[in-house]
């Protein structure tokens, strides 16, 4: 088991079994009477299973949010399937940001997007193709940088929230939890 988990990683799970717990400074690494290494291993596997459970449901939230953003914005801006790169609809500072530019460049390398760009000889594919390949964080930032407060409000209301700022805060909290889970951090 130790080779499966790693000594350093398992150390995070020993902490609750130490006499010095919850004190983080000057830990003495002396275990409470009756403590077995299996307790830390069991805690590790519980944490592992919990992270995977969270990921299962967070994935559904992420896909649902992405779908609603694409659907609602694309229906509002029917005349412009490339609304996600148009400064008429999205803050110019965001469109010019390195993070967004890099995300679009990466999305353009995906087979479906590349085929669209080549087939129609254009520099951008429609939102419903490209946004599928953007990270959750970039999609949230795109939402945050929409110029139309009414659209942001309507999307937020789909989740029962009247404030798009509060909704964005919730989505960013979910994103951080997702990243913790996806990268194996200790919950």
Locations of the language-model features?
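Extended intrinsically disordered or low-complexity regions, especially N/C-terminal cytosolic tails and loops
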Residues: 1-176
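Acidic/aromatic/glycine-rich contiguous surface patches that form carbohydrate-binding/processing clefts
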Residues: 184
